[in-house]
């Protein structure tokens, strides 16, 4: 296993483990998701540079666009949750009360 592949997979797994174990606050879950998306962006950008293909060079930009949309939707949910419930604790949220 190459060191670059190991670093990308370990960074992605670190974000995934943080998302699985730190599910008490919405902000920490959003930060773990952003770390995972950043790892995927760097991996796809490196992959498209190694291939020297023009057809795969647009994939990192598409991934970055989806990451920005995910971040804006997550921050909107965070603001709405903190205004309505007073905190970002995920244990206080109930979908039946919305």
From Swiss-Prot:
Its EC number is 7.1.1.2. It is found in: Mitochondrion membrane. GO terms for cellular component: mitochondrial membrane; respiratory chain complex I. It catalyses: a ubiquinone + NADH + 5 H(+)(in) = a ubiquinol + NAD(+) + 4 H(+)(out). It is a multi-pass membrane protein. Gene3D superfamilies: 1.10.287.3510. It holds the Pfam family Oxidored_q2. Coiled coil: none annotated. It is an enzyme of class 7 (translocase). One of its GO terms (molecular function) is NADH dehydrogenase (ubiquinone) activity. The chain crosses the membrane at residues 1-21, 26-46, 58-78. It comes from the Eukaryota. One of its GO terms (biological process) is ATP synthesis coupled electron transport. Keywords: Electron transport, Membrane, Mitochondrion, NAD, Respiratory chain, Translocase, Transmembrane, Transmembrane helix, Transport, Ubiquinone. Belongs to the complex I subunit 4L family. Core subunit of the mitochondrial membrane respiratory chain NADH dehydrogenase (Complex I) which catalyzes electron transfer from NADH through the respiratory chain, using ubiquinone as an electron acceptor. Part of the enzyme membrane arm which is embedded in the lipid bilayer and involved in proton translocation. This is NADH-ubiquinone oxidoreductase chain 4L. It comes from Scyliorhinus canicula (Small-spotted catshark). The gene is MT-ND4L.
């Amino acid at each position: 296993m190459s060191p670059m592949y190991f670093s990308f997979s370990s960074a992605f797994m670190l974000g995934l483990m943080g998302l699985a174990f730190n599910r008490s606050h919405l902000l920490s879950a959003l930060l773990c998701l952003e770390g995972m998306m950043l790892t995927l962006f760097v991996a796809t950008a490196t992959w498209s540079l190694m291939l020297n293909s023009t057809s795969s060079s647009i994939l990192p930009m598409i991934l970055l666009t989806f990451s920005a949309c995910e971040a804006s939707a997550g921050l909107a949910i965070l603001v709405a949750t903190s205004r309505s419930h007073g905190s970002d604790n995920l244990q206080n949220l109930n979908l039946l009360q919305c």
